[in-house]
Structures are given as C-alpha cells and as structure tokens.
Amino acid sequence: SPGMGRHGETGSVFARLGVPVLQAMVTYLSQEKWEQSFEGMDSMSVGSSVFEPELDGQIITTVIGCTEKQQGEHGSVSRTVPLPAQIDLVAGLAVSWGRLQVKSASEKKVAILLHNMPPRRDMLGCAYGLDAPESACRMIRSLQEKGLFLQRSWENGAELLRELLNGLTNENDTLSYTLMREKSAGVLAGRDYEQWFTGFPEHTRKEMEERWGQAPGEWLVLDQQILIPGIQNGNLFVGIQPARETEQEAEAACHSLKRPCPHQYLGYYKWIRDVFHADIIYHVGAHGTVEWLPGKALGLSADCYPELCLRELPNVYPYIVNLPGEGTQAKRRAAAVLIGHMPPPMKQAGLYGALEELSVLLEQYRNAEKYDKKQLAILEEELQKKAEALEIPKEARVSLDGLEGWLEEIRHSQIRDGLHILGKIPVGTRMEHILEFLSTGGETREVLKERLQEIPKELDAVCATFEGRFVPPGGSGCPSRDSREVLPTGRNFYGLHPGQI
C-alpha cells in the first residue's frame, strides 16, 4: 500500500519514488448533476477519492470523469464519461510539477504571497501563529541556496516588509495616480484581461459585473491596466494577496463561497501565471482567501474561482498544523501541498488543549454535514456537552457559527510566547516554554526535544517542492494533545482520519 499516511511504519512507495502524486477523481454523479452540484462529489466517493489519498500525501486535484446511466441490452448500465477540459487541467498541473524536476534552478521563477486580510497596511503579512515576513525571508534564503536567481537579498523579514509597504499595497488612499503607477510591480493590460474574461461562463461574468462593474473594473485599475502590488527581484516575485473585498466587508467575505472577488484579484493571479511566468507559488501562513473563493466544495470545475486563479500552477502552503479544517480547504479547493509548521506555545496550555478538542468536534461536524449526515445528531450532542463543560456563554452556543466565532476570538486573545518562524528551532527560554506546552501530549521531554530538532524540515519541504519532489504526509492538530501524530512538522498534513468522521 502507499502507506495510508504512515510511511515511516509501512514504507510508502510514493516516498521512495520521491515525486509528487496527483489524485484525479471520478464521481458517480452524471455530468449534468456534477456541473450543477455545489458539493462537487458524491458522498460515496469522498472517502476513497479524497480522504485516503490525502493520508498518502497525494495532491488533490479535481473530477475528470462522471457516470452516466445508459439502457443496454440487459438493462441499465453505468458508464464513465471523461471530461476533456478537466483532464487537460490535471495533465497541465502534472506537467508543471514535472517541469520543476528538470528545469534549471537558476531559470525557475517563484512567486511568494503574503496575506493581507483585512486589506490594510497594518495587516500586511498577517498569518495565524507565524511570523510570515521573517519566514518568507528564510524561505527565500533557502531557495537562493538551491539556485534561485536573485539580484539582491533582504537581511530580515522587517526589511522585506518595509520594502513591500513602500511600494503599492492594497490600501492606497493617500497615493496619487502617478505614484500608484510608479510603485506597481507590474501591470496586466485590461484588454488581455477582458479577452480572458469573455470566456467565463455567463453566470460568472454576471455576478462579477453586478458587484465590481464591467471588466477590468476600477479596483487597482488605472487607464485600463490592472496594477500589481509586490516586488520583483530577479526570478522572484514577492506579492501581496489581493483584496477579496473592501476593508469594511472583508471579514464577512473571508469564508464566503458565494461572494465574487474583484476583477483585480483574478487579474493578479493571471499576471503571476502568464506575465511573470511563475513555475511555483507559495502562500505563506494561515490563512489566505483563494481557497475560499466561490465554486464547488470539492472536484472543482475549470470555471470555479480558485481554478481560474491557479489553473496549472503548483501551489505550496506553509500552514500551522493545529488548523486542519482550514488547511484541508486549501488542499481540496486549491490543489495545495501543505507544509505543516509548529504553532507558538500558549501560556494557558491546559485551556488551549480543551479548546482544541472542541475545535476537532466542530471539524467533525462540518465534515459530517457534507459527507455523513447520520452522525450529525451525535456530534451536536457532544458539542453542546463540551461547550457547557467549558462554560461557553449561552449566546455563543445558539449556533455553530456562533461557537466557531467565539472559538476564533478566544484563540486570538490567548497570550502567545512569540510567533513561530518557519524552520527555526526554539532556544533557551523559548525551548523551555514549548516543552512545557507539549508536555501534556504523553511524550517525555527528551523525546519531544529530539522531535523539535527536526523543525528545519519545514524549510527542507519548501526546497523539496521547488525541486518538484514529494513531501511526505503527516498528521495535524495540537501538538500538546498528540505530539506523536503531529511531530515532526514539515510534512504535508492531512485532516481527520476517515474513521473519525
């Protein structure tokens, strides 16, 4: 067997081959039902087509075939019908990953995006539990050592962030049009965007035009040219993920699978693909917005917004290991290879562990909503019991959305012992704090310390993807609850085991 996510125990053939493995899917839905479906996959196929391949570290792509019933001589017969456009998409992605293995390192082009949600200057480089600018700087240094061509370097993350802020950003109210144009890292011609846009399905064009006007819109557009915030440095582009909505609407739109993004959002990714010609893109930290754009929940079609953005571009995502529900969203809707990174230790480790148990139950409930509704009543009862035991306010327990909102607020309000830096082993008092944080997971301090010495694997995985190599799978969750499953970090983490749903 490929390993079922436990390659260290069984010996995964994927790990031995060392190449990325793409999982394409066939659904029992007819083509008509699939095209109209929000779920994108039938519930019978999800386990074998999504959950199990994730355990093996496969890249989850999309549906390439549907099932049609036909009347034959002996009654109804099911036949798999290929979807040519979808097959082309997966084949193109396979070629892109393969190209990373054979292309000279000095010729490869890399895009690294920092998040910016809400789209204010003070939120540039935000990432849950991660020092994203410093981590990006360490990624760049590691890739340069592997051969990435740069014209100059940054001493640290603060210097990188300062240069980004001195350029064009998603918040430019005080800049003149002349300065906006001068500070833009590049432009996408409006006519090129419009020509591309006319090929979108009618309903997609209509919903975008109703919200953002006719292509190419007005958001970060000057003289019919879409502006591109970021920095070009040799074969590297360090960008700022585009704003999905106005600052006032950003929070409400963040997790919406219904709200269309601005024209500039799609144009920004098109520029990365077709003008800058990136060979690979890295989204730094939890979490971005591309995986939450409108479209199917699984098995996306070529006109779902995440596919419109990324197309055949390899997508890699350093992501905090204790947010598996949101991380797997990027795996399933943006074909992402996740690189799990350590969370920063919490001062209130005991409470944090209880909150993580609640978070796991919420994730199980959300999965059951999509794939196994028979479990909902049992999980809802468990959720209410856990919420009552934690003395969560009644108003937060009225709905699951309220409970998730309360949990997110508490997470952000807890005192962290500094942000994690990708690939950096904690030392001194930081090491002591993190060992204390992990000590509730059942391992000895000696074993934990040994596993923490493997944190540099987070950067090793970044370099592996740059070279088109396989990133081994691993578990996710709070390391203080189950360090054996979660550590070491630097693996392509999966969410819940199917048996937990």
Where do the model's predicted regions map?
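Ligand/cofactor-recognition surfaces for anionic moieties
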Residues: 1-501
